[in-house]
Amino acid sequence: MFSKIKKINFFKKTFSFLIAVVMMLFTVLGTNTYKAEAATTSFGGQLKVVGSQLCDSNGKPIQLKGMSSHGLQWYVNFVNYDSMKFLRDKWGVNVIRAAMYTNEGGYISNPSSQKEKIKKIVQDAIDLNMYVIIDWHILSDNNPNTYKEQAKSFFQEMAEEYGKYSNVIYEICNEPNGGTNWANDIKPYANYIIPAIRAIDPNNIIIVGTSTWSQDVDIAADNPLRYSNIMYTCHFYAGTHTQSLRDKINYAMSKGIAIFVTEWGTSDASGNGGPYLDESQKWVDFMASKNISWTNWALCDKSEASAALKSGSSTTGGWTDSDLTTSGLFVKKSIGGSNTTSQTSAPTFSLQSGTYDSAQTVTLTSSDNDSVIHYTTDGTTPTSSSPVYTSPITISKTTTVKAFTTKTGMTDSNITSAVYTISNTDPVKQVSAPTFSYNQEHTIQLKL
């Protein structure tokens, strides 16, 4: 501020005087500003296993439904932020499985590139508020112990980087086969890998494959693992596997273990032939009756019956029914998706835009149950990576709030905003000048 000079005449007679100075001080008001957490969890929150059921954070049984990728070394281009967002909004998908093969040009021969593909998919799922299965896709290697050291190192790294996110699910061995058995091979492998993950991530779900291409869940049920939040996978293809495999699942669940069908197809076990929609419907109805979560094989345009997309389809979503195969149409309907998905309602602000003379509190609400509000307070456009609204926002200075609503199975709302100007909040402070005594005239300079 500028200096103000004032000449003050003093008479020879000694006297005292008091100078009152009023000045405006710009101060920052209270520092208890609301801090939001990032969007790190899907609609069910922290998953857990209760008895034979996968449950949400409140202990309520939940059924996840979604898509599995094909091998990432071949069809990773179909699994990206845009395609996953489309599946979430248009089909109602809430889980994605990233199938990272060990052999056939997969992780063992190309660890760095395959790991980067997995990381991109996992981060996209987190940003989209979806669950994601990290699949160690053993197949031609038959026995999970073949690469158990690489598996341990890989899952430790995944747990270190993503274990804090409840979106993440670990699948530690896709389809043990070729004479590999539960007691001598798979269970010892699981007892080696699971503690390595649990030392870093104590809570997220771990899924374990079973013998005979993950069909022998009944054998695992008679000799289960002794850890919490463990599930066992059963894989089926409708043209090959029918009631006898459902009987195995019924038995396993009656023994108290939880099942997650991380891979199933409308085709026969080769991935081609069919699709067999009548038997597929029996399976879909069965899984719904048991609250068994599932991911369908496969999100790709490969020329085989189990592929969801026709050859040459877009890799970034936006698919209409004409882009889908017979299998893709069936699976979309089974998940609950529609190409006429409604839009969720925009959030409502408790306080209108305007000028206020003191700090204000703003509440954001949505008329859609189970929806999530993302917002910003710096004037930037909010995205699904922006903070999730969980409690009132304190406005202590001029602020632009922008927000939108998301809900699984619906398209995102329009972005709404409000501008709040806070004025006259700077306190006026009265400062007393010192007392002076002179016996002759002086000039005093006051600096404000």
Swiss-Prot record:
GO molecular function: cellulase activity
Lineage top rank: taxon: Bacteria
SUPFAM superfamilies: (Trans)glycosidases
Protein keywords: Carbohydrate metabolism, Cellulose degradation, Glycosidase, Hydrolase, Polysaccharide degradation, Signal
Residues annotated as signal peptide: 1-34
Positions annotated as active site in the UniProt record: 175 (proton donor), 263 (nucleophile)
Pfam families registered for this protein in UniProt: Cellulase, CHB_HEX_C_1
Residue numbers binding substrate: 70, 74-75, 101, 137, 237, 269-270, 297, 302-304
GO biological process: cellulose catabolic process
Transmembrane portions of the chain: none
Catalysed transformations (reactions): Endohydrolysis of (1->4)-beta-D-glucosidic linkages in cellulose, lichenin and cereal beta-D-glucans
Kinase keyword on record: no
EC number(s) stated in the UniProt entry for this protein: 3.2.1.4
Additional facts recorded: The C-terminal region of C.acetobutylicum is not required for activity.
Similarity remark: Belongs to the glycosyl hydrolase 5 (cellulase A) family.
Protein name per UniProt: Endoglucanase
